[in-house]
Amino acid sequence: STDWTIDILDYCKDKIDYLISEEDNGIYDAMNKGILASTGDIIGILNADDFYPDNEVLSKVAKVFKDSDCDCVYGDLVYVNKGDTKKIVRYWKSGKFNISKLNNGWMLPHPTFFVRKSVYEKYGLYSTDLKSAADYEMILRLLLKYKLNVIYIPEILVKMRMGGKSNRSFWNRIKANHEDS
């Protein structure tokens, strides 16, 4: 990483149990490494500029997994101003999952997607040959192909700062689409 991440993590080292800092083949390769190294039963992936809106999010997600036989959980996401994270730029209200919505291009917000580790072990990791659509392919694989049981939590689970790899600009989106085709 070239964005001061290692310096920040070094500053917080007393709160970190495990750290991998090495070359990888893109964001999805890094995510796969994290999944393989994880020791918990539930995996959520939070990107560099994303954060949970409060300290209760993980407890709420854990409760849904504990109280049900679901394989996956997701919720809503808000895009926030990079300089003022209280200022909401866009609210991504996911709504309840159904196959027809997915068939028509609906996508749940990937940073809000929590999955049992056993699901990754059974159905595989992210496709590293896709540059920006591996998260979408994973959603399609798990929910459409394998029809896993997913539960929607109708709350904001993640805040995403504007300016990241996929939402920096319209041209970034076009470039990403071209890379994945």
Model-derived features: where do they sit?
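Nucleotide-sugar donor-binding/catalytic module of glycosyltransferases
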Residues: 1-172
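Compositionally biased, charge-rich terminal segments
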Residues: 170-181
